[in-house]
Every structure is written in structure tokens, then in C-alpha cells.
């Protein structure tokens, strides 16, 4: 395994492209089989096997290789097509001017030089699905996380085949470590450069002592059991690991477990110094898919719920949860009209250099940036759409999602993400100014069945024309449920330097439970939106 891998250098201008996709964190193959079985033609007679294979490969290419072979772009996002066909990139990391990613089909560790516009790709020594035909299900091997260690010398990445890999940039050698986690997914380094990681099909936390690990062995790895009393009565096959984040300042590791079908999720706080789980947080049933996890500058835990349109903050000092939501899923995803059961599915969260929290909206086809101080959400539209991953009407010319699967943020708040459906990586340039900001009151209070007027001031830093937007934590899909909200004006056009106050009248439904909710109010256009959170106290 220590032999130097095959290396390829490819100019950006000479790429061939075919494109690809995904739907969830575990049952990808099952989804593909189900979708294919609904759409594959019935074939019988001589040559049936060959024709079936051809039909299945064609369907696979339509769903997992996409149809948009050229990179797309908008004001903020610019895509880059990968050099090989059907690479299926997922995990990604940024190292200065280099962007690293893993091809889950081809078994390649790739790097893109953002200054030169060139690729290097290194063949991972062992990747069983590399040689499988597209007609095999699955014909890929997931690599969810790519990390660069503190020295900047090594690239680490997970491999669903119970493996973690390390690539040395200087020697161009790979080391392979067999780990006790089943289907390793997320990993992070502690302040000493050691590894903590989880496996999708494991219900434990795992530790890797980097000074003791040995190539080709499981030496130096240990399992840290998590108390599972909260999942009593649930089959272990249904309990999976969600997310992980290491708190280097406080020497803690936060982990989430979930049983999605049972709408059950928990957060665990593990103290590195005492080697004990010191806190277990039972999540409400409407937050049963805690996946992405990150810490803000104050030690609060932020979690993306990959079963709804919700992301939330857990405050350890107050032991409470505050919910926020994305915008409602765009009708562009569905060819003109958003169905009532459409969710944006926030997936992973990472913190930018300025403390802002980034997350990818898996089925919302957006990248979100949330300011935890201002409680302001900016969402950036991803310009590619694969119609095979939405219920698109035949007449729709624009429909689908790009399946943005993982992302990384550099210190300057530039973000790179992978598009598993499109065989592309993409850069989001957050240094470009968003054309508007929104000012709202911090909170309002009203009784059930009553109405209140909320003043929303839209301030333009450049010319802007768009639509007013509202969403709320009343429903899992960010809709208002039986409550209602009406803007005094649905459209807004502003010249640079101007502002406009628009009224939003919110009426709480008669049977709404007392408590605190959040409404997100703002405006957006085809490329970007800006929304502010308003606390709504139902008394």
C-alpha cells in the first residue's frame, strides 16, 4: 500500500464530463433500485440480458451522471467539471490554493489547483467498486469526510469499507487503516492531532491515536461506548450515527445518534479528559434526524436536521433548544409548484472564519450561511439541476437538484462543495456583496387566534429586484401550517442605497400551542436571499 499511486495531471480545459447523484445517507442503493424499477422498460426475448444491462446503464447515467455536461454559474457560484467521467465526488477539503476531494466511483483522491486551474488525481490503492459496471448496485463506495491534519502534510479521508486512509503530499504514498467503526463517516482531530470518528452503522464513538496507528492494521484505534438506554426497544439495525464535532477549547466531543423511522434522536457530550459521557440530550420527536454538527464561538452546538427544513441550536449552559428554518423549498426544484411535503433537508454544518455557520440544503439546492449573532440567513442558489431527483412534470424545462453533498470553508469564507449528481465541484464566493439586508424586530408576542403586524425593512446596497419571503418553525417543511402571513407587497424593487418598509401581518391559528416559535422574514431573487429570524411568543 505504500507504493506511489498513479497520478494524472489534467488541464481544466481538456476535461470530459458525465454527471451523477444521491438521495440519503444510508439507503442510496435501495433508492436507486426503486427508481429504476419504476422506469426501466420491460424487455423479453433474445438478448434480454444485454438489453436489460443497456437499459439499466442508460437509466443510471440519466440519474447519476446528469445531463448538464458543462459547468454552470451564477453571481455567486461557479462550477468546475471534474477530469474523469462519473467520478461521484462527496468528501472535500481546502488546503490553501488546493481543493481535495474523493471520487467515490473511480476510487481517486483528487486535488484542484485553484490558481492554475489544473487537476491532479491519485488512484487509491484499494477501491473495490472501481471495476464494477454501472449496472451493479451500488457501484460506488462512499467517502463522506476529507480532512487535512494540523501539519498540512497529510490528507485523511473515510472509506465506507471500514477504512480510513492517509495520503502524504510529499511522498504521494497512501496508508490504509482498518478501523472498528462500521461504515466510517465523520471524523475530526483533537488539539493533539488525534482522531475521533463515527460510523453510520455503529452506535459508538471511536478514537485513533495517530502516534500508534500502523499501515494496514487496526493498531492504535479504540471504541468508546455510548449509553444507549434512550434507544431501548429499538432494533440496533435502526440506530445510526449522525454527526460529530470536536470542541478543542473545552476538550469535548459531541456526537449524535438517531433512529429515523422511530423519530428518535440524541446528542452526546463526551469529556476527553475524564473519558466519560457527561451529557445526553433527548431531542424532540420533530428533530429526529440530527446529522451535521458544529460549534459556534460560545460553545453552543448547532445541528442540521436531515429529515425536515430545520436547523437548531443547543445551548449547553441553559439546556435548551432554539429552532430555525430555511426558506421554503423553491418551486424551481419541482418545475413550477412546491408540493406540501417538500423539505430542504439541511445536511452538514461548518463554521467560517468570521463565526458564521454554513450548511448545505440537500434537497433545497442551496447553500446557507447563518450569522448566529444577527440571526440572519443568506441562501445561495446552486445553478445546476438534475431532473432525475425531483418529481418533475414532463413539460418542465427547469427542475431538479444538484445533490450538493459535502463542503468545506476556507478562512476567507470561500466555500467549495461537491455535486454528486453533476460530476462537479463548485466555489461559492462569499466575498461578493449580497444586494440587500433586512431589519426586523427581534421578537413579537400575541395570543392564539390574534394577529400582529411586523415591520420588515429591506435595505439595498446595490440594485435589487425580487420577492418577499417568509418561513417558520410551525411545520417541519418551514410552512406556517394553519397560521397565516401576508406581506403588504409581495414584490420589491430597490435602487442602490435605498430602503423600503413592508408590513407582514401574521395571524396565529386558534389551536396553536403556547410557546416560542421562529419566523424567518426577508427577500430574495433567483441567485440569493436574505432573511432575519423573529421570535414569536404565543401567549
Tell me what each language-model feature is.
Residues 59-62, 78-81, 120-127, 175-179, ...:
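Beta-propeller fold detector
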Residues 62-86:
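A short helix->beta-strand "capping" segment at the edge of beta-propeller domains
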Residues 432-539:
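Long beta-sheet-rich domains in secretory-pathway and surface-associated proteins
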Residues 83-96, 128-151, 180-192, 198, ...:
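Beta-rich, blade/repeat-based domains predominating
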Residues 113-117, 167-172, 213-218, 271-275, ...:
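Short loop/turn segments that connect beta-strands within beta-propeller blades
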Residues 100-106, 139-141, 155-161, 195-204, ...:
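Conserved beta-strand positions in repeat-built beta-propeller and related beta-rich domains
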Residues 1-48, 521, 539:
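Secretory targeting signatures
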Residues 395-434:
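Blade-level signature of beta-propeller repeat domains, shared across WD40, Kelch, NHL, RCC1
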